[in-house]
């Protein structure tokens, strides 16, 4: 069984309009509501690959019920901690440019935080645990450290996709895999300019030296890089019209891990992972897994 943990679940509202103007009523051409949060996205993608998983985290209010119902509709097991308030609503506007409006999330009490910690302590050894995304109000960054320590103690395969600089401290617990994007990677190492490919690889190797077992770096239109202690691989991206980049990294991560669980080699899993990221970028929500093989045929893998 695979477990995902999303501490700041969300409902994402995707809207499309010809243009977005100030001080007037902007009418949309299309709208779509999607259950979201990085771990939630990963749960959907894993299930669509045929992999059972359990979704953990915090949910609240009518939005929380929507998120949980959508997961249950796809036969995904849920074990959320219900909190006061409502799970946040984020807005993504596709106009002449892409706009992203992301809210903070509900305030989490100490009791509810401890309840989630206790659920994670009960995960059997050897299982995958994805900890992904931001933290809601009331949950300090050291929560990532606490959960990383529990994962190490319980011999879980910990996968981290977080933008907090605390990630660097979590590396001492030797996570199975981490997935920064280029911007996060630059921020972790206090680089103010965009990184060259050579610099990205250097930073990725530094993360390995600090304790990560594997590093997957999502690069948008430039595909992805994968590093472990034996190899460095580069994947291109597929070509298409970008609609929404919000969930592409989540799809990439889920498919990279999921395909290996289904027996694929690392290079083949990376090929499909890059395809999943591209398909999602070309969609309003998560990419269609039925198109994975066809899209993966466009992806080139290079050993660096």
Curated annotation (Swiss-Prot):
SUPFAM superfamilies reported for this sequence: Ribokinase-like (SSF53613)
Top-level EC class as recorded in UniProt: transferase
Catalytic residues as annotated in Swiss-Prot or TrEMBL: 250
Alphabetical keyword list: ATP-binding, Carbohydrate metabolism, Kinase, Magnesium, Nucleotide-binding, Transferase
Cofactor(s) recorded in Swiss-Prot or TrEMBL: Mg(2+)
InterPro entries: 1-PFruKinase, PfkB_dom, Ribokinase-like, Tagatose/fructose_Pkinase
Entry EC number(s): 2.7.1.234
Gene Ontology annotations for the cellular component aspect, listed alphabetically: cytosol
MF term (GO), any: 1-phosphofructokinase activity
Reactions mediated catalytically: alpha-D-tagatopyranose 1-phosphate + ATP = D-tagatofuranose 1,6-bisphosphate + ADP + H(+)
Activity regulation statement: Activity is inhibited by tagatose-6-phosphate and fructose-6-phosphate.
Pathway this chain belongs to: Carbohydrate degradation
A Pfam match: PfkB
S-S bridge residues: none
Family: Belongs to the carbohydrate kinase PfkB family.
Protein role: Kinase involved in a D-tagatose catabolic pathway. Catalyzes the phosphorylation of D-tagatose-1-phosphate (Tag-1P) to D-tagatose-1,6-bisphosphate. Can also use D-fructose-1-phosphate, with 40-fold lower catalytic efficiency, but not tagatose-6-phosphate or fructose-6-phosphate.
Name this protein carries in UniProt: D-tagatose-1-phosphate kinase
Organism in which the protein naturally occurs: Bacillus licheniformis (strain ATCC 14580 / DSM 13 / JCM 2505 / CCUG 7422 / NBRC 12200 / NCIMB 9375 / NCTC 10341 / NRRL NRS-1264 / Gibson 46)
Name of the gene encoding the protein in the UniProt record: tagK
């Amino acid at each position: 069984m695979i477990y995902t943990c999303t501490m700041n679940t969300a409902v994402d509202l995707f809207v499309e309009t010809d243009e977005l103007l100030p001080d007037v009523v902007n009418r949309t051409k299309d709208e779509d509501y999607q259950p979201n949060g990085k771990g939630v996205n990963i749960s959907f993608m894993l299930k669509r690959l045929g992999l059972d998983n359990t979704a953990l985290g915090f949910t609240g209010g009518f939005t929380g019920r929507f998120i949980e119902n959508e997961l249950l509709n796809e036969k995904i097991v849920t074990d959320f901690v219900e909190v006061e308030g409502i799970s946040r609503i984020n807005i993504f506007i596709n106009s002449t440019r892409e706009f992203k409006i992301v809210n903070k999330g509900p305030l989490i009490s100490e009791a509810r935080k401890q309840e989630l910690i206790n659920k994670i302590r009960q995960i059997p050894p050897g299982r995958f645990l994805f900890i992904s995304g931001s933290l809601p109000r009331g949950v300090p960054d050291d929560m990532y450290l606490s959960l990383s320590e529990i994962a190490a103690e319980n011999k879980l395969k910990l996968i981290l996709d977080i933008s907090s600089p605390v990630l660097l401290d979590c590396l001492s617990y030797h996570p199975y895999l981490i997935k920064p994007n280029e911007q996060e990677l630059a921020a972790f190492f206090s680089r103010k300019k965009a990184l060259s490919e050579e610099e990205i690889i250097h930073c990725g190797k530094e993360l390995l030296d600090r304790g990560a077992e594997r590093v997957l770096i999502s690069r948008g239109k430039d595909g992805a890089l994968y590093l472990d202690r034996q190899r460095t691989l580069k994947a291109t991206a597929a070509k298409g019209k970008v609609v929404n980049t919000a969930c592409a990294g989540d799809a990439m991560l889920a498919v990279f891990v999921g395909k290996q669980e289904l027996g694929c080699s690392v290079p083949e899993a990376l090929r499909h992972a890059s395809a999943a990221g591209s398909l999602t970028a070309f969609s309003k929500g998560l990419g269609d897994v039925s198109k994975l093989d066809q899209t993966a045929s466009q992806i080139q893998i290079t050993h660096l």
